[in-house]
Amino acid sequence: MTIERNMKGLLGTKLGMTQVWDENNRVVPVTVIAAGTNVVTQVRTPATDGYNAIQVGYGEIDGRKVTKPQAGHFGKAGTTPRRHLVEIRTALAADYTVGQELAVDTFAAGEEIDVTGTSKGKGFAGTMKRHGFAGVSASHGAHRNHRKPGSIGACATPGRVFKGVRMAGRMGTDTVTTQNVTVHAVDTAKGLILLKGAVPGPKGGLVVLRSAAKSSLTSGKEV
């Protein structure tokens, strides 16, 4: 059985990192997120869909680049086409209305959130970079195999390589979630959210901000 929580969510664009001063005159590294205006394009309820959720749209897109079903979906919501659509499961779905706009003040300073993004692509990487292998000795008989992975299996038994063996390959471009990121400040005038520390993804990448699922601020409390 799925436990429904009172989740809030926004979509935004990662602008990059900078540093600011806090109230104690300490430098705090922050990531700047431009959340802009999000719009609720659909509300799911147990009566119609079997669960509670909201669909949030973000980002501009030329209306000529959307399909007719998509155009009808946005027209039904009474909004212009949006580039990104994300569904957020929340027990508070009944509190939202289709066409409602969500701003950066959805979250407040000091709140903990989970940030989901697509990690930077690193291309084809070896096992030392991709999986943290130690490599082979630099000397003492090691000959041109300093960064090799070593053995990947046994001999005639089992006579194959097991699935899941860590090897070299494409690294990055994965969906990554950083949990319990603290909101340092919210600028409603500019539509910006400052998050303490780093978050996944490159500059200009799409990020999804959700209420923290395992927040230390609400541990032991009902959410």
Swiss-Prot record:
One MF annotation (Gene Ontology) recorded for this entry: structural constituent of ribosome
InterPro entries: Ribosomal_uL3 (IPR000597), Ribosomal_uL3_bac/org-type (IPR019927), Ribosomal_uL3_CS (IPR019926), Transl_B-barrel_sf (IPR009000)
Listed PROSITE patterns: RIBOSOMAL_L3 (PS00474)
Disulfide bonds: none
Domain of life: Bacteria
Alphabetical UniProt keywords: Ribonucleoprotein, Ribosomal protein, RNA-binding, rRNA-binding
GO (cellular component) term, any one: cytosolic large ribosomal subunit
Pfam families linked: Ribosomal_L3
GO terms of biological process kind: translation
Main function: One of the primary rRNA binding proteins, it binds directly near the 3'-end of the 23S rRNA, where it nucleates assembly of the 50S subunit.
HAMAP family assigned to the protein according to its UniProt record, in alphabetical order: Ribosomal_uL3_B (MF_01325_B)
Family: Belongs to the universal ribosomal protein uL3 family.
Subunit annotation: Part of the 50S ribosomal subunit. Forms a cluster with proteins L14 and L19.
Protein name: Large ribosomal subunit protein uL3
Organism: Nocardioides sp. (strain ATCC BAA-499 / JS614)
